[in-house]
Amino acid sequence: MCHGLIGRFFCTAFLCLLAIYVPVARAQTGAGIEQTFANSLTTIPTENLSVSGAFYVPAYSSVSMSQGKTRADFSVTLSIHNASETRPLVLKRIAYFDTAGKMVENYLKAPIALKPFSTVEVFVPTTDVRGGTGANFVVDWAATGEIAEPVVEALMLGGLGSGHYAFISQGRPIKAVGKN
């Protein structure tokens, strides 16, 4: 705690410096995925992508509590795991939608390919409440042949008062084309 006039001055100065030098949390962009997870990526296969699918992943960036009188905001980390030991997984779309079903953000400008057993993530900070209480992701994927189904999950972290919460939402397949 800061006591006295001098203590308040130093406390205020420290908080101002902290505000200047600590980066603001922002939602991750498509370029951020490619740069942050460069070691998880490989070149897009030249063969025909004969197997494809899509996952729907609920993502609770906000949750109503106390009969709707209180709202708890959560950070969301979407993790997309290539569960194949042998084939790359091509991600064609990672889209974030709000409660009304309107697309908030598309995280890929172009398809990317994950190495076998690799993972990429998308982070939505607690301060980004554009998704609301019914936010969700849709992840479109493809592969050159039979492949282990990707594992797609969202981890929500947040708190309200002295309580802290963490929970996971698993993606559900909503589309499959080709033999898998």
Protein language model regions, located:
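Sec/Tat signal peptide C-region and signal peptidase I cleavage site
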Residues: Y21-A27
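Intrinsically disordered, low-complexity Pro/Gly/Ser/Thr-rich segments with frequent PxxP/GP/PP motifs
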Residues: D98-N136
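Bacterial N-terminal signal peptides
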Residues: F10-Y21
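Short, hydrophobic/aromatic beta-strand segments
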Residues: R87-I94, E105-Y107, E149-V151
